[in-house]
A protein has these predicted regions:
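BZIP DNA-binding basic region
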Residues: 461-515
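Catalytic metal-binding/acid-base residues of hydrolase active sites
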Residues: 245
């Protein structure tokens, strides 16, 4: 399913009915946070309110390539005293600020406001090192044909002769290695900026984009990611780095879910996968990392938090090593050398082709150069005095050289050498089934990867228990969680069964009287 907004909400409701599932089974986040479920009346009320004030304040249409995008904090202060969707005044309090953020998010998810109209200052700009070069070249060649001009008066005419009557040559194009030639677009996403001193130089070295967030990544960050993916045109692998705590475990899922949702609009054909790589329980156990016990509101027991900083403090350099190892899984280490070899092979082929096609022209060029040499040697000594005479005597040769150059140009234009294709990157995509998010998966297959095996098995068992056979007509039907005791597929069958039982009851009474 690749649906947006209200269509997604309706789709999930219908799908839940068909499968005998509760809607909560078919979403990966909470009702108010999963973009595929946004579209309930309460969501739409807030979204339409935000759309109205967005238009009223003149903010619409500032996104995309425009520079004057709007930050929501500015909207907050402009709204003070204005009416909220329920008529109550908007105040300068945290509750109303969160109300605005929620309404803004719903409006963008439902397509009422362009996500790119809103600027994101909560998260810093990503460090982009992997991008398509502006001067990317296709396979081919560029001719280099000198002007073949004989010298005008100079003090060093023989050197001028050698320099300007060189043999023509061809240079292959499209064989220069660039990191953009690598097979994958890789990004490292990290929840906190305290690791920038480690990750930024590493990502720059490996031409890997680095996106740093403060807590949960925003819709703006995800849309910007999809813009980069669409521009690169390459399969994308997102490596997620976070603390190990309740929030850290949910953050990759939240980013994956937002990416899954918005990719339908911004990169529908993209191959995107996301996987948390740091911190994991195995890494915590391996390095014996200490945890902080933090109580969340309402928790009866503390939530164990292990910070990224603990890994770097206990095992200096290990974070960089883990990230480097994961990035290099998607890089072709021999690609640069193969580009060099391919360019050398193409150059050799061009040299051979040019020598074969221009043999007569080059021979004539050398003859003309030798014919010019004695004249130049003689007039070099008398240059100042005999400049005018030199020009007159060389004029016939210049005409001949122009003819040779014209002939060479025609021959080069007709060349169609069978140049080898530039090397294609080769990299194995490891652990094909182990990715938390894969854009090629269907909706239910992807949902399975968001659930734990136990959650998935429980959901399947619950759905099976809701599939019933009508006790009256024998038709299969699906009941809901609230009325699992239903025996009949619809009201008509229930009434028919009731009437049949009444007839049987009265029949038994009549038979009893006769007996």
């Amino acid at each position: 399913m690749k649906a947006n907004g209200q269509a997604s909400h309706k789709y999930l409701k219908a799908l839940a009915g068909e499968m005998g599932a509760d809607v909560s089974d078919l979403i990966a986040l909470s009702y108010d946070n999963d973009p595929y479920y946004i579209g309930r009346p309460s969501h739409r009320e807030l979204a339409e309110w935000f759309q109205g004030i967005w238009r009223q304040r003149g903010f619409e249409g500032r996104g995309g390539v425009h520079l004057r995008r709007v930050h929501q904090r500015r909207v907050h202060y402009q709204l003070l005293g204005a009416a909220k969707h329920d008529g109550r005044p908007y105040e300068n309090i945290t509750t109303d600020w969160n109300y605005l953020l929620k309404a803004s998010r719903y409006a963008r998810i439902l397509g009422l406001v362009n996500p790119e109209d809103i600027i994101d200052r909560r998260n810093p700009e990503p460090h982009v090192y992997f991008y398509r070069p502006d001067d990317e070249q296709e396979k081919g060649f560029e001719p280099h044909i000198p002007g073949f001009d004989l010298p005008a008066p100079d003090t060093d005419l023989l050197s001028w002769l050698e320099e300007n009557l060189k043999h023509p040559h061809l240079s292959p194009t499209g064989y220069d290695y660039d990191d953009f030639s690598q097979p994958y677009h890789v990004e490292v996403w990290v929840e906190k900026s305290t690791m920038n001193d480690i990750l930024q130089p590493l990502c720059e070295e490996l031409s890997t984009n680095l996106a740093v967030g403060v807590g949960y990544m925003t819709i703006t960050s995800v849309v910007a990611l999809l813009r980069r993916i669409e521009a690169s045109g390459k399969p994308t692998r997102i490596l997620y780095v976070s603390d190990f705590d309740k929030a850290g475990r949910n953050m990759p899922k939240a980013v994956a879910r937002q990416t899954e949702f918005w990719s339908a609009m911004y990169a529908p054909d993209a191959d995107i996968r996301l996987q948390p790589i740091v911190l994991t329980q195995d890494q915590i156990d391996k390095y014996d990392l200490p945890s902080l016990n933090i109580f969340d509101d309402g928790d009866e027991a503390p939530d164990d938090v292990v910070e990224l900083d603990a890994l770097e403090a206990r095992v200096p350099g290990e974070l960089a090593s883990i990230v480097r190892e994961n990035i290099e899984r998607f890089r072709d280490k021999e690609l640069s050398e193969r580009f060099t070899q391919a360019k050398e092979g193409a150059q050799k082929m061009l040299d051979e082709q040019l020598a074969e096609h221009l043999a007569d022209d080059i021979k004539r060029l050398d003859e003309l150069k030798e014919e010019a040499r004695p004249t130049i040697e003689r007039y070099e000594r008398l240059l100042e005095m005999l400049a005018a005479r030199l020009e007159r005597e060389l004029e016939p040769l210049q005409v001949s050289l122009n003819e040779v150059r014209h002939a060479i140009e025609e021959s080069v234009t007709a060349l169609e050498p069978p140049l080898p294709d530039p090397p294609q990157p080769v990299a194995t995509d490891p652990d094909d089934d182990g990715w938390l998010f894969d854009s090629s998966r269907e909706y239910m297959d992807q949902l399975k990867h968001y659930k734990t095996p136990k959650q998935w098995q429980e959901m399947q068992a619950a759905m099976r228990s809701r599939h019933k056979v009508c006790a009256e007509c024998g038709t299969s039907f699906v009941t809901t969680r609230k009325v699992r005791g239903r025996r009949y597929c619809d009201r008509n069958c229930r009434q028919r069964a009731h009437r049949r039982r009444q007839r049987e009851y009265h029949q038994r009474k009549r038979e009893a009287k006769k007996g």
